[in-house]
A protein has these predicted regions:
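Glycine-rich, mobile lid/loop segments that gate access to catalytic sites or pores
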Residues: 117-216, 231-236
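Short connector loops/turns at beta-strand edges and beta->alpha or beta->beta junctions
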Residues: 88, 107-109, 114, 136, ...
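Well-ordered alpha-helical segments within folded domains of soluble proteins
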Residues: 106-113, 160-166, 213-217, 283-285, ...
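Hydrophobic alpha-helical hairpins/lids featuring a short glycine-rich hinge
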Residues: 84-142
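Hydrophobic face of alpha-helices
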Residues: 23, 27, 31, 108, ...
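Terminal-appendage/accessory-domain detector
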Residues: 1-101, 203-213, 220-468
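Well-ordered alpha-helical scaffold segments within catalytic/enzyme domains
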Residues: 39-40, 112-119, 165-171, 218-222, ...
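Short helix-coil transition sites and intra-membrane helix breaks within transmembrane domains
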Residues: 98-105, 153-158, 276
Length: 468
């Protein structure tokens, strides 16, 4: 059975098997997760989630053992993972994997931190769970996509539930049989529809919180003897046939289980990407390209007559020309490009400022906002067949701007094949620290040094140190 082999790997994996490169990457990912989540906790969605949890569980006492990042109190493991997961994803700045087409760190660290602090696990145990989560998560995501995503499922919610179950099972030291039961329970709870994304709701960030919650719940249930189906992934009415394949009559053997199992434990965690801009990852190549053009035209954006964006199909589908709220704005390719061309800065603070100045309203007195709207009105988004052929190994975008007669109707264009933050076009550690500082200017950055030596500490100490 497929999941039985996965469970064996999870149960047997040890810290000593990790490469230096993997350890370096996951420590950088932990730093990034903490910075994004610390800032994200001030957003509306995690605040609502936290208030809801307190409404259901209105007690704070010494028996509550897991921290909510950025808060000065503790709660239970499930609630902490749930709220931290939402906060980790709400800014659209959390890490992911290009081929697996999902966000990993938001689920993995929300799960691992809650359990590791509550049980005061060692840094080595914490890292074991984190690396196993990345390894299995990347493999499962690559196995089911792009078909799974193309059917309308948000892989971060669906496969993310399995990932959380993997991490929780490892940290709770479940044996192979218990881990298999936990993954079986994860599969029957795996959920997440991309309509939440397109609808401009908070549902998309709920997927991360619920993935962490359900994965942890599954592992605890399995530890206590609750059983789950060992064929939930590849069975006749399992995950693949109901949520991935176009036709349930397809032969399940088209999936290369042998290759997946052969590669388990060999996936390079280094292949994850880190995000620079608070927009959907599919928009980042277009943002990078627009910023290159901004460097060429400077402040002459009022002379832009029209803009054409040629990109791959999934990116082109993010063609919302009239976003009504922040959630919709983060998925709007026209606005992402226009903001880049006008202000040359794509940060959380800048986006919030533009919204305050009327970016999402029908009228504004601010010149930059009106310039952005004018560019959006003169923009076309095109799905390009040749660029689409390069996806998903590349995420290309070609942005073309035509200037007015003051510039002799000149045409500027540029193309990006892989956005900033991918392994082949990486964000360096100093850039991740700059990202952290930009999000959290009042945080004492010296607290982060504990992450460099996680192996030397227990996780309760690590959390206290990060709290400052």
């Amino acid at each position: 059975m497929f999941l039985q082999n996965i469970s064996k790997f999870i149960s047997n994996y040890r810290y000593e098997q990790a490469t230096v490169e993997s350890l370096t990457t996951v420590k950088a990912a932990f730093l990034d997760f903490f910075g994004v989540t610390y800032r994200g906790m001030s957003e509306e969605a995690p605040s609502i989630a936290l208030n809801t949890i307190e409404e259901i569980l209105p007690k704070r006492n010494s028996n509550l053992t897991a921290s909510i990042i950025g808060q000065n109190f503790k709660t239970d493991i499930l609630s902490a993972a749930f709220v931290n997961g939402i906060a980790a994803h709400v800014l659209e700045l959390d890490d992911g994997h290009r081929g697996a087409q999902l966000h990993l760190g938001a689920v993995i660290f929300s799960t691992a931190l809650a359990i590791s602090e509550a049980y005061d696990l060692t840094g080595r145990e914490f890292l074991e769970g984190v690396i196993v989560g990345y390894e299995v998560g990347i493999l499962l995501g690559q196995l089911v996509n792009p078909k799974h995503r193309n059917k309308g499922f948000h892989t971060t919610g669906t496969i993310g539930t399995f990932i959380a179950g993997v991490v929780a099972s490892k940290l709770l030291k479940l044996d192979e049989k218990q881990t298999l039961n936990a993954l079986g329970l994860c599969g029957t709870q795996a959920a997440g529809l991309l309509e939440s994304d397109h609808g401009g709701s908070m549902g998309k960030v709920l997927h991360v919180g619920k993935a962490s919650y359900n994965g942890i719940l599954s592992a605890f249930l399995a530890r206590n003897g609750f059983t789950g189906s060992g064929t939930i992934f590849d069975g006749d009415e399992g995950f693949l046939k109901t949520m991935v394949l176009d036709n349930t009559n397809h032969d399940i053997d088209e999936f290369s289980f042998e290759n997946v199992l052969k590669n388990i434990g060999k996936v390079r965690v280094r292949d994850i990407y880190f995000k620079k801009y608070p927009f959907c990852r599919h928009l980042h190549s277009s943002i990078d390209t627009a910023l290159k053009l901004k460097a060429s035209i400077g402040d002459e954006y009022n002379h832009i007559q029209n803009v054409a964006v040629k990109t791959y199909e999934i990116a082109a589908e993010h063609n919302n020309f009239h976003p009504k709220n922040l959630e919709e704005l983060k998925q709007s390719l026209p606005y992402a490009v226009a903001i880049s061309l006008v202000v040359g800065e794509v940060s959380v603070d800048k986006i919030n400022q533009l919204i305050e100045f009327g970016l999402l309203e029908n009228y504004s007195t601010v010149d930059d906002v009106n310039a952005i709207k004018n560019i959006v009105n003169g923009m076309i988004i095109l799905s390009d067949d040749k660029l689409n052929e390069l996806y998903p190994s590349k995420r290309p975008s070609n942005v073309i701007i035509k200037l007015d007669d003051v510039f002799r109707n000149g045409i500027f264009q540029n193309i990006t094949f892989l956005p900033k933050g991918d392994f082949e076009n990486p964000l360096q550690l100093r850039e991740l620290i700059d990202k952290f500082k930009g999000l959290n200017p009042h945080y004492d950055i010296k607290n982060l040094t504990v992450i460099d030596s996680l192996e030397d500490y227990n996780m309760k100490y690590v959390v206290r140190k990060l709290k400052g």
